[in-house]
Amino acid sequence: MENLSELFGQYAFNDSMMQKRLPKETYKALKRTIEQGRSLDPAVAGVVANAMKDWALEMGATHYTHWFQPMTGVTAEKHDAFITPLKDGKVLLEFGGKELVRGEPDASSFPSGGLRATFEARGYTAWDPTSYAFIKEGTLCIPTAFCSYGGQALDKKTPLLRSMQALNKQALRILRLFGNKEAVRVFPTVGPEQEYFLVDKEVYRKRPDLVVTGRTLFGAKPPKGQELEDHYFGVIKPRVQAFMKDLNTELWKLGILAKTEHNEVAPAQHEMAPIFTTVNIAADHNQLTMDIMKKVADRHGMVCLLHEKPFEGVNGSGKHNNYALSTDTGVNLLDPGDTPSENAQFLVFLSAIIAAVDDYQDLMRVAVASAGNDHRLGANEAPPAIISIFLGDELNEIIESIVNASKYEAHERDQMKLGVHILPRFPKDSTDRNRTSPFAFTGNKFEFRSLGSAQSISGPNVILNTAIADTLMKMADELEGAEDMTTAVDALIRKTLSAHMRIIFNGNGYDQAWVEEAKRRGLLNLPTTVDALPYYVAPKNIALFERQKVFTREEVESRYEIKMETYIKVIDIEALSTIDISRHLILPAAIAYAKDVAATINMKKSVAPELEAEAEKALLSNLTAQTNALYKATDRLEAVLKAGDEGADMLERARYTRDKVITAMDEVRAAGDALEGIVGKSYWPMPTYQDLLTSV
């Protein structure tokens, strides 16, 4: 491998490349745009485009694309060659400021939730200069926002940038009140931990459910799953290690800060975590990471599964969204310092986040709602569907002392003593970790743990940014009119924390007692996507988005429609796949096995009537019963699907899908899995869980 420092970012048009390629004044103008959010001069765009093209051609690129993130949850791109024809039959290689700054993809073929009709095809992509352009497979990719002809956001990047703008505005107001005149920008930094499964490609291809839906719709429990807890942080297998090495190289070339890799809890499950970066860049990088994971896995004869629950009975995959607030002067506003009880600025931002999560706990749940994630949340492997905040012992004691107006007694930091003289002593952290909390403070950041592994991080961060911005706005309004700043800050912190103590929970989120306690506290428990999504369009939430200029009412309603429709379609596809596998694979296999068992019984009788065939008869009886059960359950599922009212209200259709279709699917699976336990291995038409989870 090349020298890592030389390898890193070689396929990204990053700051060092800009400095090298751009005239000094052009570079300064572009940096002002990136760092201060100023509009870009069209003349500057032309110079940047030309430098970008020359660099891309030297790196072997032949095409360029406006790379964007529509509301499908995956990325989109249309490739155009740099060539322009000349009269003599030759071509000129061109790429100007207009091509860099703006594109015009068809907007009618992407999900719009009613924002665009099929005949209203014009849409625009607009360059996001804060996220570096990069070269992928011979194409110069320019990160862009995507909007309609009328200016409505049709993507995930536009609202994220709007929410960053709102948060920056309100956070700076707070900083100015604390006398900070140096900071020009406040921005969220995020590091998303990405979980995934790896399975052998040939084994995967023999599982039509995995191929079509991303998860197994049938599968009996294997003899060994994750019971021994020996996979987590275990020795990485050579084939997986080779994949990880290749993945790191690909990510580093693009300037993605891949940092940590390890085995996760479930067999064949792993994790990759990057270093923090600005949230819109982190979102772009995470989308790229998921795409590259799949391609690198394919090169290694494997398939990377990003579904939240590919296998029943072992842990699913999530994505921990580590969230902090930083200034352009390098200050982390969520760092409590050595004496958090005396750090008023930290306590203002902390109390703002606590209030935001409490006031908009419904939106926090909406942000992570999907058919796939419903399998994880609250299943003793992921945080519960009830949103709460874990702060740890030290911060909890500080907050209680503020609320109760009592004196906080600071504790001296203990030293870790391991009972072995040769081992070093080191300061013990002020709090333990709580893996059952959906939103946990972990020293100098919050970790939002409810995200599903396949989802874009943009949506959850839009909601976090917007809710925090709104709370900071109210705080700034109150403090700016205060006569005595110190007294006003103390009173504001106490009032805010007192009003939102219910959202703080430091206990076991998996415990059923917490469900009852949360209900007493008035916290929402929204176990499924269908329960959560109506809150997206609640009047208070639409008002929030409009107040912070992140979404219009129409944009919120469109996202509600898209998420609801996606939920219905995903489960319909799973149901149809369940029927197909049952009828064309499992039932024929069970019948063929039953036929051979029956033939064995008859053969015994004909050869030696005195020979007993009790085992065969019992097996045949069980086979027949389970085969009949599967046949009937499959027919019921088909009838349930046909009975669904296509003309019904979207919410009613979603409720029908959740209550009827999923229940009918579960019955088919139960019968199919029972048959897997008794049908001979050589007859079974698909690789088993044991085959899949030990295939790499």
Predicted segments with their positions:
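Gly-rich Lys/Arg/Thr-decorated short loops/hinges at beta-loop-alpha junctions or inter-strand turns
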Residues: M1-N14, T33-E35, P223-Y232
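Catalytic pocket of metal/acid-base enzymes, prominently hydrolases
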Residues: M1-Y27, D41, R122-I142, T442, ...
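Active-site core of metal-dependent hydrolases
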Residues: L7-E120
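Active-site proximal loops enriched in glycine and acidic residues that flank catalytic Cys/His/Asp
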Residues: V44, F68, G96-G97, H262, ...
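Hydrophobic/aromatic-rich, well-ordered segments within soluble, folded domains that form packed cores
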Residues: L57, A61, T65-Q69, A283-R299, ...
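Short linear, low-complexity motifs centered on an aromatic residue
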Residues: G73-D88, S108, R207, G214-T216, ...
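Glycine-rich, acidic/polar active-site loops that bind/position phosphate-bearing ligands
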Residues: A121-L306, N315-G318, L325-E561
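C-terminal amphipathic alpha-helical interaction region
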Residues: I493, S498-V696
